[in-house]
Amino acid sequence: MTNTRKTHPLXKIINHSFIDLPAPSNISAWWNFGSLLGLCLIIQILTGLFLAMHYTSDTMTAFSSVTHICRDVNYGWLIRYMHANGASMFFICLFLHVGRGMYYGSYTYFETWNIGVILLFAVMATAFMGYVLPWGQMSFXGATVITNLLSAIPYIGTTLVEWIWGGFSVDKATLTRFFAFHFILPFIIAALVMVHLLFLHETGSNNPSGIISDSDKIPFHPYYTIKDILGVLLLVLTLMALVLFSPDLLGDPDNYTPANPLSTPPHIKPEWYFLFAYAILRSIPNKLGGVLALVFSILILMLFPLLHLSKQRSMMFRPLSQCVFWILVADLFTLTWIGGQPVEHPFIIIGQLASILYFAIILLILPTVSMIENKLLKW
């Protein structure tokens, strides 16, 4: 008798992706973040759908519609805070997932890696537009500041900004289109995730040693399904602890004041997950230079496969590269801290040094250290 799981056209795709998928026998907990990101996306789409049922994308009523959700809708407060803090969990998982790829050399699957970088951009765009929707002070100021950056593009900049705004300032048209884009983008992200997995399953997963593991594969189910369930439990535990005990921990108090174009918050800053990029943007005194540095700070990830000069794929057996990698992580923490500080001494110079170090490590120090390690191993 034939097994439906292996013959049915739809069930077969699921089977080859999540059940009978050959997986390396030694992948660690760092490989859990793919499934956790999938879960985060599902949580965000579902909570977002229920929020959209009660939200109005009009400047006059947006803020009060969010208040209405929190006060009058059954479990509206829970849905709203799960959505807001779910975004934070999404980015934590994203950063760890990307960091894992950098450490273990997963970027050598460059189709998978490049789709991943595009996904990162898409998620960042979605999060930015979502932050504008409650129409609080920081929503308004953030939308104004970030969209204004496009005016740095020579010749077409000003026209482009006014086109995105749908007027001469951030107003009703801007809010409505941001809501439309914020709704559609997660579904585009879901489609890109499919492509990401398609490319990944062409090659199979990498593993901590970076050595080809074709000779030693195990089925994904039950080994990694049970392992993923543990990750899911920990993620849900963290998310619900955040939502139920301190839902506003990662938010900005300014966003509890309705948007007022006539008064600007003293310190405009984005959500914590954009602070590192915001610090890089602010550390360059020139507007266009800052915008380019901001874009390149993420786009630089696409250069990783080209900058890989080591004879070994993973950093597992490369202590010097490990050192440099963890300095890069510390540097990103420093940038995140600086992004949340006011623009004054000594934060300005710390931010500039941290920004220079960020690009130097990726473009110069890591490749150089890789070559030194090759020499030490007489390769």
Swiss-Prot record:
Residues annotated as coiled-coil are: none
GO molecular function terms noted in the UniProt entry: metal ion binding; ubiquinol-cytochrome-c reductase activity
Q: What SUPFAM superfamilies does the record tag this protein with?
A: a domain/subunit of cytochrome bc1 complex (Ubiquinol-cytochrome c reductase), Transmembrane di-heme cytochromes
Name the needed cofactors.
Answer: heme b
Q: Write down how the cofactor binds this protein.
A: Binds 2 heme b groups non-covalently.
Q: Name one Pfam family in it.
A: Cytochrome_B
Positions that bind heme b b566: H97, H196
Provide this UniProt record's keywords sorted from A to Z: Electron transport, Heme, Iron, Membrane, Metal-binding, Mitochondrion, Mitochondrion inner membrane, Respiratory chain, Transmembrane, Transmembrane helix, Transport, Ubiquinone
Principal subcellular localisation of the protein: mitochondrion
- Binding-site residues for heme b b562, renumbered to this chain: H83, H182
In the bilayer, the protein is annotated as: Multi-pass membrane protein
Please give the subunit comment from the record: The cytochrome bc1 complex contains 11 subunits: 3 respiratory subunits (MT-CYB, CYC1 and UQCRFS1), 2 core proteins (UQCRC1 and UQCRC2) and 6 low-molecular weight proteins (UQCRH/QCR6, UQCRB/QCR7, UQCRQ/QCR8, UQCR10/QCR9, UQCR11/QCR10 and a cleavage product of UQCRFS1). This cytochrome bc1 complex then forms a dimer.
The text of the family note is: Belongs to the cytochrome b family.
Give the protein name, as stated in the record. Answer: Cytochrome b
- Name the gene for this chain: MT-CYB
